[in-house]
């Protein structure tokens, strides 16, 4: 895989999402050095932080896009909402800030794990998961890097288009989002 130097911003809820996204990008061949920035919720409601910061990051992405190659990666848990409801909330945040909705040609990728990112990790570890479960899957506090070998497996499956048919629907949607954005970043 070739090395790609792109200004990348990751907007996410927590450390687990950050580790997941960084490792995924690295395995896809992106160089994450000084052209990389993470916006992560310091404390409190992570999804609220992402929703509130999203419009600001889109404005910055659009302001910079003619100067350099950039990409905005957004991770936000669906929690008890549907993926579509969470995406609509992000659209609404743009509208409230007098911004156009995300356009197909923009290098803005949104990944919405249903319940939480841990649902995806448990699935990748071989656990049967239920995105409709009443309680979210337990976090890997202070062991966020446990996801790395499973992220590598996911990178290969998404890239080759052979994600298992019983994969969680939100993970299938994420692979679709990845396939949408990859041609844009060359």
Task: Show where each model-derived region lies.
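Short glycine-rich substrate-engagement loop in P-loop NTPases that contacts/grips substrate
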Residues: 47-49
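Phosphate-binding/switch region of NTP-binding enzymes
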Residues: 13
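Conserved SAM-binding loop
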Residues: 10
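C-terminal accessory helical subdomains adjacent to catalytic cores in phosphodiester-
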Residues: 1-7, 16-44, 54-186
């Amino acid at each position: 895989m070739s090395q790609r130097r792109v200004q990348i911003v990751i907007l996410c809820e927590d450390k687990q999402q950050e580790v997941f996204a960084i490792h995924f990008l690295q395995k896809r061949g992106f160089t994450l050095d000084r052209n990389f920035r993470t916006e992560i919720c310091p404390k409190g409601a992570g999804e609220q932080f992402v929703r509130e910061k999203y419009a600001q990051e889109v404005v910055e992405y659009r302001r910079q896009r003619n100067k350099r190659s950039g990409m905005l990666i957004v991770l936000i848990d669906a929690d008890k909402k549907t993926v579509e409801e969470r995406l609509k909330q992000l659209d609404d945040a743009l509208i409230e800030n007098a911004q156009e909705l995300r356009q197909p040609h923009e290098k803005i990728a949104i990944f919405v794990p249903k319940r939480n990112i841990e649902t995806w990790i448990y699935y990748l570890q071989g656990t049967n998961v239920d995105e409709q479960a009443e309680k979210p899957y337990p976090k890997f506090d202070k062991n966020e890097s446990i996801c790395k070998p499973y992220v590598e497996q996911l990178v290969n499956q998404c890239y080759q288009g052979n994600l298992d048919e019983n994969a969680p629907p939100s993970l299938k949607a994420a692979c679709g989002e990845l396939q949408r954005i990859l041609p844009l970043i060359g």
